[in-house]
Amino acid sequence: MVKKIIFILYILVLVCMAAATIVEKSQGTDYAHAHYYGAWWFILIWAVLAALGAFYIIKRKVKCASTLALHLSFIIILAGALLTHISAKRGMIHLRIGQPTDTYMAQDEEQGMKEEKLPFSLCLKKFEAKMHDGTNAVADYSSKFTVIDGDDKSEGEVSMNNIYSHRSYRLYQSSYDEDGKGSVLAINADPYGIPVTYTGYALLFISLVWMLFDPKGGYRKLLKSPLLKKGALITALILSMGNIQTLHAESATGNLQNAVLPKETAEKFGELHILYNDRICPVQTFALDFCKKIYGARSYQGLTAEQVLSGWVFYGNTWANEPFIKIKSGEMKTAMNLPDYASLNTFFNREMGGYTIGQYVQEYYNGQQDKFHQQAADIDGKIQIIMELREGVSLKVLPYTFTKNVKATKNHPFIKAGTTTWFSPVDKLPQAVEQQHALYIKNVFSLLNGDVKAGNISRVNEFFVKMKKYQEVSSGNSLPTATQYKAERINNAFPFATILFMANLTLGFIALFYTIYRMTKKREIKVLNIALPILLGVSFLALTFGLALRWIISGNIPMSNGYESMLTVAWFVMLISILMQLRIRIVMVFGFLISGFFLLVSHINQMDPAIGQMMPVLNSPLLSIHVSIIMMSYALLSLTFICGIMGICLRSHGEELQALSRIFLYPALTTMGFGIFIGAIWANVSWGNYWSWDSKETWALITFMIYAVVVHTQSLPVFRKPLVYHIYITLAFLSIAMTYFGVNYFLTG
């Protein structure tokens, strides 16, 4: 009876959490917290579930120490969460320079925000927003203040990911005033909940690792299973790939023969630096992104990306007639009878009122966001990129380093001495820019355009060489290092995801068919036995090199966007496969195929491969560790998914596949547990709230709890049946899909 109640409550908690994330999307965060996460009945369900779980473990006289420690850690974590809910104080304090403040706005579930008094005062001395050199991308925010506590005074400072503690109050950088003379700090006082919760986290981490090495635990027994030593795994996995549209390079059309720079000259243009995507990078990077975003490929009719970009800059009228804008299938394409690739001039017609889709774009921003208007907005976005390039707005290739402070005006903010700003030829320049520099910035492209139109290519080459020298002299400390520059040029030259997804999928199918042949014919092909593991290693090293390049370029671990995280999952899949394929040969097949499909996803245009500056709050080692470990768990769980599909298809080998799947499942749960709660520690360090019921973390917890069910084979013997196990583990993968994709695309915004 107790077991049934526990099972019902467990399902109820999962359903409530999932429902709350959906309600939050429609009703807002405050509503979801008030009526679900913070509701008395939700807390009661957790409390009863924890109490009955403890009672059931005692009743069954569980003696496995690692199991007892693991479940005890969950009870301690829940106890800490309850203490935080009951006793913690949270709020915001607004500071202005030179004005002592001893009150803050506290969060109150019933009254919303109310004013509370602090047992000390704070007086802001200075607020500073530090930028990445030469860009408008913020590197960090910091506030320096004086703490006045009775007769005692002390100095304090907070910045992103760096907190300040006084008594039981912890202060976090949250926001700031636009004039730079005020700062908003988050306040958190939780002297009881955090120590208890962190104790639970520590015990959880110890017990998760202990679970893998405990001689009396289920995982060590599983590793000794005779099923893993059988050689009768006949793989019958049918994988199919959709048609992938490829664009074949052709020679430039006659219209473009006289509207492009020679390849060598365009390459010199690509070697210049530009302020793009809030960082300084080669113009080549901007050119590649321009082609991919507008045309959907890295080149156009045999022309390099640099030739295409320079063509639009210097021969814009000719290029405006080229079918360069990719039009995706959709309602608007059908209604307006648009081709797959349209020219810029297609969308400008005086007889139809000028900009032919302008009305639809305006309607989109006025709220008509159906499929038709979404496509109009998408096309408009591409057109705006082209127009900004033609006007020169996006060509921020001309740096200037200010030698003295510049007062703020309506055209520019306050500029500190030593700051480097990158200008385009059409920007309004501050009066503090020296005249010779101002003349160069304003006129260099006009002079360059004259030589291009005159066909004086040697002069154009000379212009680009001198412009590069000007950048080196005038850019202060904003240029990337020589190593970063070379790394980016290499990264641009080799589309690692595209090359490796094709290689890995091809080798995966070869390995799959060879495995079937080897198991059915009982014959070995020595060349393949040697070549396939080596090729997996080569692919792994190539991807490692590609990720290392991105790390060097950005200075951040390559996990800052969907594209990079897909590459990282593929990397972990290959690493796991390499480590395990000597013991379990079929893992190599999984390694090729699963990494290939993750690389394929990263290749798809829905994921933007652009490298950018990381938000200050995200620039934390804890976040990097959190994401890395979560990615490893996803890689392991994707292997259990493949085992599940095979187990359903090949029921005669269900037991062997179940054993193999569970080999992946235990470390997957370990890494997921580490990842979720290291993320909680990072959140607490960054903004003072270790668990905020964000949709992403809520679905990660749901996923963890769903997968944890199948390891309870003693209390739920139904999961000892291979078919039941495989069906459950296959369906469980939907929770990962929801966590990774569903939250991003359906539950945000």
Can you describe what each PLM-predicted range is?
Residues 1-749:
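Solvent-exposed, non-transmembrane regions of integral membrane proteins
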